[in-house]
Structures are given as structure tokens and as C-alpha cells.
Amino acid sequence: MKTGSPVSQQELNQMGSAKIFLIEKDGVQVIEKRNPTQIEVAFYQRYAELFNVLGIHVPRLIQFDDQKNVLHIEYVPHVVDQAFLLEDDRVIEQLVKLHQLPPTSDGIYHRHQWTPQATQQALTTLELGSETEQFFHNLQQRSAHLFDGHNLISGDSNAGNWGQRENGELVLFDWERFSTGHVAIDLAPLIEGMGTFDDYLKVAGRYIKCAEKGETTELARDIGIAKAWIVVEVVNILVSRKNPQTSKYLDWFRQTLPQWAKSLSAQVMS
């Protein structure tokens, strides 16, 4: 493989801002991220080694060239699928370990937020019915506590950001949305699609059993709110970055969200 050659650029880049390449460095395959965010660079410099020691497996930092703003990190060779996230107990276990760590006063974190303006921007793009739109506005008004939390969170725990090392260790990568916030933000992406309230209850129950604290129904409601926020985030990011898959995602949301909002309204808004 030639150094610097892109491998499935569309898949590797996903929706992040950095340009990502799989390259060969000193005879070893590594991930090269060009123009990574300050948040992700700081994560690998400050947290990667500690997290791996604690059993929160993340890619190892190989090198950061601050002159070129190029980050080299461990390549995790084996992908996992969506179903795996709910089949393997290590996923929840590692998230619990992460969430139990306190943030530092000098930490560099992504600022997650959900504003009325962002909601309206996404809804204008989606062109959903008035009832569905009102449901999203109502959830936004109930969401402030998701972003006031004192837990460290990945901020982007979807299936595409998990992989396995050759030795079988489960690794969570892509830390440009590393932040503080509610654990529901990391639990919502574990559920395929929009999911149902029963799905949220199951994940909440497993998480609380592992963390040994919390209330299942309350956490399930927060997962539902987080799901709605992620829709707003994804729609606005897709449009702003002119992602080639935008129309596919928008079509799916338009087909799915009205029924999802209708079925979830009673449980989440109660």
C-alpha cells in the first residue's frame, strides 16, 4: 500500500471534519488524520494511554505533527456491526467506566448543545408534519439536563466508531466529539435506527445494572430525547458539509420520524 493512499475515503471519513487515510508507517498500518480538531488531538495526548490502562480501549497515539497538523493513531482492523453493540457486554462496561471518570478543569471538550434554532433548521430541511415538528420542539425544551452533566462522554458511540484489535479487545475511536454530558448521549446510538421505548428500557436496564445507580424509566426517557437530538445534529451536519449521502438519510428520516414520534410521545412526554 502506498503511503497516503485513501482507503474507502467515504467510509473512513464518515461525517467527521478531518481527512482520514489508512497508511503504512515503518512497516505498520496506521490511521492518519489530517487537520484533526484540537479536541481530538488533546484527547489522544492526555487520555489515550490512561484510558487503555483503565480498560477503556481507544486507539493508541503514535505521533502528532503539530507543524503539519497531522495525527497518527493505531489502526483497529476489525469492524463490528450494529447488533454487536447490544450483544457484547463489554460495550456497556466500557461506557460505564468512561462515564465514571470526572472531567478536568483544563480539559478540552466539544460543546454539545441543542438550541431552538438548530431544531428549526433541521425541521425546515426535513419538512415533517406539524405534530412531529411540535414533538421535536417539545423535546428540545426538555433537553437542557442532557448537556449539564458532569460525566465524561464519547459523544459519538455509533457502531461505525467501534472496532476490535487482533487480540479481540474492543476499541472505541473517533473522539472529536469527546465531551461532558448525560450518559444517554452515549447510549442512544447503541440502538439501531430510532428504536422503540421498549428498546430504550432494555438498554437503560442493562446500563443501570452495570453502573449500579440510576432509574430505568427515567434513563429510557432521556435516551429518547437524545435520539431526537441526534437527528437534529445529523441532519444539520449532513446539509452543512454537503455529504453525498444526505438525500438517503433525509428520505429515511421522513419515512420513519412521524410514526416514531407518535409512538413515543406518551412515554417520553409523561
Describe these PLM feature segments.
Residues 2-25:
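ATP-binding glycine-rich phosphate-binding loop
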Residues 89, 171, 188-191:
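Glycine-rich, phosphate-binding/catalytic loops in enzymes
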Residues 1-5, 253-270:
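Regulatory N- and C-terminal appendages and interdomain linkers associated
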Residues 28-71, 81-100:
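A conserved alpha-helical element in kinase catalytic cores
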Residues 184-215, 227-259:
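Active-site activation/catalytic loop segments of kinase-like enzymes and analogous catalytic loops
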Residues 16-24, 140-185:
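Active-site acidic catalytic loop and adjacent metal/ATP-binding pocket
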Residues 78-113, 129-136:
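Conserved kinase catalytic-core helix
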Residues 67-84, 120, 228-247:
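A glycine-centered beta->alpha junction motif in the catalytic cores
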